[in-house]
């Protein structure tokens, strides 16, 4: 389901039967409709980025709801798929901040310790936020709480009002928060563009002795 260290720590935060409730939810929704991402990618963020290697969290809201887009990592799509508008703007800001990245698949970020987590881990086809408020938020809040309890600094990148509300869960003063409006076309020009989240995250990581992320990889 998830990387074992994540599983053990999250289990301490959630009610005892919560994993069972999640599995029942997944059985039901995947049996009765088209749901993204593919079921074996639902927990991909926690499988690719182990707890002990997490240096940065980029929090999304829910997966892309179109065919072949969602792959279990927030904002990421396969390289064969055109970049959705929010990802286009992320890559545009990255180009202005650090340099040009030609890949839409953000897996290499995840492999370097960037946890690409959505607050909701599933979505019904064609219905953005269609699974909001049903099962996922306590689980993904638990992920943030587990990171908050770490004794090694984490950089939390929070884009948009929804993600920024999660700042209330980040109470440990050793951590760092970078926040701005969302990269969506509706809000990117209100302060996402020019916010330089990638170079700012690297400056923090370097200062903390944790090594920089190669955002262009």
UniProtKB/Swiss-Prot annotation:
The gene is ung. NCBIfam families: PRK05254.1-1, PRK05254.1-2, PRK05254.1-4, PRK05254.1-5, ung. Its main location: cytoplasm. Keywords: Cytoplasm, DNA damage, DNA repair, Hydrolase. GO terms for cellular component: cytoplasm. SMART domains: UDG (SM00986), UreE_C (SM00987). Pfam families: UDG (PF03167). InterPro entries: UDG_fam1, Ura-DNA_Glyclase_AS, Uracil-DNA_glycosylase-like, Uracil-DNA_glycosylase-like_sf. This is Uracil-DNA glycosylase. Its EC number is 3.2.2.27. It comes from Streptococcus equi subsp. zooepidemicus (strain MGCS10565). SUPFAM superfamilies: Uracil-DNA glycosylase-like. It is found in: Cytoplasm. The active site is at 62 (proton acceptor). It catalyses: Hydrolyzes single-stranded DNA or mismatched double-stranded DNA and polynucleotides, releasing free uracil. GO terms for biological process: base-excision repair, AP site formation via deaminated base removal. Coiled coil: none annotated. Transmembrane segments: none annotated. The lineage of its organism: Bacteria, Bacillati, Bacillota, Bacilli, Lactobacillales.
